[in-house]
Amino acid sequence: MPKQLNIQLLMTGNEVMSGDTIDTNSAHIAQVLGANGLTITRRVTVNDDINHLLSELSDMARTADIVIMNGGLGPTIDDLTAEVLARLADEPLVIHPEAEAQLLAWCERRGQRPNEANLKQRLLPRGAQIIPNARGSAPGID
């Protein structure tokens, strides 16, 4: 029998920690994984604090086969996922051409010009690959 993958899920956000936002994303991710014969072995929710995120993600990276991180990709100051990944990879944040193109296309579809906050979303750890996002302004990061 093949070894079961150790899949860990890191949910982020002060709004989730406070209960202002109900975490429906974990259930959706678990259902999609389950439909493919996979299960989550650990799920943790962390507030928008760089040190807490670094600590938890570093631990998961050491112990999991796969880490899925949800949240923290938006344009606000407390969206820290790209910065956390850059620090853990010891890589600088750089303008990612594909992320920038996706962001500009998202703004154009809405008849908006990107503002300074939006432009933050084109900054990814050097060497990162994007996961296209058909709904939002920020891509996922692989």
Language-model regions, residue ranges each:
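Glycine-rich phosphate/diphosphate-binding loop of Rossmann-like nucleotide-binding domains
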Residues: 2-43, 48
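Short glycine-rich anion-binding loops that position phosphate/pyrophosphate groups of nucleotides
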Residues: 14-15, 72-75
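Generic recognition of short, well-ordered alpha-helical segments
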Residues: 20-24, 55, 80
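Structural motif
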Residues: 47-58
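Proline/glycine-rich low-complexity loops and linkers
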Residues: 52, 79-142
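An anion/phosphate-binding loop that grips the pyrophosphate of nucleotide cofactors and donors
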Residues: 64
